[in-house]
Amino acid sequence: MHSPKRKKLTPADLAGLTVAIVGTGREGVSLARMLSAQGDVTLTAIIDSEGGPGEEWDREFGRTIPVHVFNGDSDLPEGIDVAIMSPGIAPHRPLFQVLARSDIIMTSGTDMFMAVYGDRMVAVTGSKGKSTTSALTAHIISAHGVDVSWGGNVGIPLWDIRPADVIVAEVSSYQCSSLTSSPMVTVVTSLFEEHLDWHGSAEQYFADKLNLLAHTPQSVIVGGQSQILTQQMDLLYPHLPRTTIGEGSTWSVSEVGGEWHITRDGHTVMACSELPLLGHHNWWNVAIALEAASTVTTIDTDTAITALRSFHPLPHRLEPVDDPSGVVFINDSLATNPSAAAVALGSLRDRRVIVLLGGADRGVDRTPLRQELTAHPPAVIIGLPASGEGLLRDIEQWCVEAGVTPPACVPVSGMDEAIAEARNRARAGDVVLMSPGAPSFGQYRDYEHRAEDFKRAIADTRP
C-alpha cells in the first residue's frame, strides 16, 4: 500500500484551497459545517458508496457542497489540494489508496483538531473502557470548578465540542492512526486485538492505537491491568515516561480488610461498593480518571468522592435494565469483541449468569473469552445469530478440553427467542447479561440498535 502525503494543518491553513471531505457521515458533516462557517475554503465531498451521502448530510447541505461518488481507478475530482479523511475510510480501501498515490495532502479532522486544541486536551483511548474513563475524567474535572467539555468518539464529533479551557475526548484507533501531533495528556486504558478488518493485523492495530503517544505528549497515563498494553508500551515507547495505574501511581485500587477501595497514595478514599459502576475493571477506570484529572487540576478528595457518587453510567456499558421480575437484565451491547465480553463476565462471577453471546464474526482472538468461560462457566449461554451457533459448539469443545462441565448452550434465531429462553431459565436474583463479544452488523444497524432490541424484548415479555 502507498503511504499518504501527510502534513500538520489547522483550518486556517486551508484558506484559499480546494478541500475534499472524504466520507459524509457524522464526522464529515461536522467538518463541513465548521469549514463552511470559516468561509474561505472551496469544499467538495467524496464517497465510495452508491447509496448517497446520507440523510444528515442532505439535510444540512443539500446541493450546496458537491458530492463525488468514487468509482475506482483514478476517479477523483480535479483541483483538490487537501483531502480530510473520515475515520471510517480504512487504508486498504481503493479510495484511500488512490488518494495516497496522488499529490493530494491527506489529513484528518482529528489531527486538525489536535493541531488547534491539543495543548488543552486530555485524549483517552483503549480497547475497553475509554468511554467511561473519558466521561469520568470530565465529570471529576467539572466538579472542581474547571471549564471542561467532553466528546469525540462518543457520538459528539470533535469539531462539535465547545472549546472549553479543558477538552476531554475519547479517540478511536481509526482516529489515532494518522495523527501528526499528540495532545497534552494521553490516556490508554487497555489493549487487546480489535478492528482487525480495518487495521489489517493485530500488530498494526496496536501501533495505530498507540500512535496517540508518538508526538511528545506532556503526560502519559496507562492502565496497569492489561499485559498486552504493558508489552506494547515497552516495545514501541520504551523511553517515554508514563504513569502506570497500580504501579506507584497516586490513585489506585486496593483490597483492604476484604473489601476493594479506591486509594490515594496508599490511603483508602472510598469503598468500590459505593461507586455507581459495575465491575472490577470499572474501578480501575475510576483510578485512571482520577489520575488523568489530576494532571489539569488539584484533586480535593471530598469533592472527588461526591463527583464519583453522582456519576451516571453511560448506556450500553453494563447498563442495568429495569424489570419487575427480580431478574437483573444488563445491557452490555458495546462489548463488540471477545475480550470485552470476558471482562463483563469476570465482573459478575459472584452471580448466577445467563449470557447472550454472538453476532458478526470478525476472526479476532477469542482466548480471553475462552479462558473466562472455562474457568468460570456461566449457568447458561444463549447463542445469538449469526455466529452464536458455531460459537456454542466451540465453547462446548473448550470446556471438554479444559475438563469442565459445559454450561447449558442454547442457540436462538433472534432477540425475542433469546429473551424468552432467558426468562424461562432465570430465577429472581439471576443476571441476564447481553455482552455479545461481537459486532452487530448483519443483524442490526449498530450496537445501539441491538441494545434497543434487547430492551424492547424485555419490555414485551415483562410479567
Regions found by a protein language model. Give the residues of each.
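Short, conserved loop/helix-junction motifs that constitute active-site signature segments
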Residues: G39, L179-S182, L212-P217, L235-Y237, ...
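Beta-strand->loop->alpha-helix junctions that form or flank phosphate-binding loops
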Residues: A45, F70-N71, T107-M112, L236-V256, ...
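Phosphate-binding loop of NTP-binding sites
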Residues: S36, L76-E78, P87-P241, A293, ...
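N-terminal leader/targeting and accessory segments in enzymes
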Residues: M1-S108, L384
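Extended acidic/charged loop-beta regions that coordinate divalent cations
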Residues: T64-H68, D73-L76, A164-W198, Q231-E274, ...
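Nucleotide phosphate-binding/pyrophosphate-handling subdomain across enzymes
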Residues: S3-P4, K8-T18, S30-M34, M270-A379
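Short internal beta-strands
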Residues: T44-S49, I221-Q225, I354-G358, P377-A386
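C-terminal helical cap/extension that packs against the catalytic core
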Residues: E56-E60, I65, T367-G429
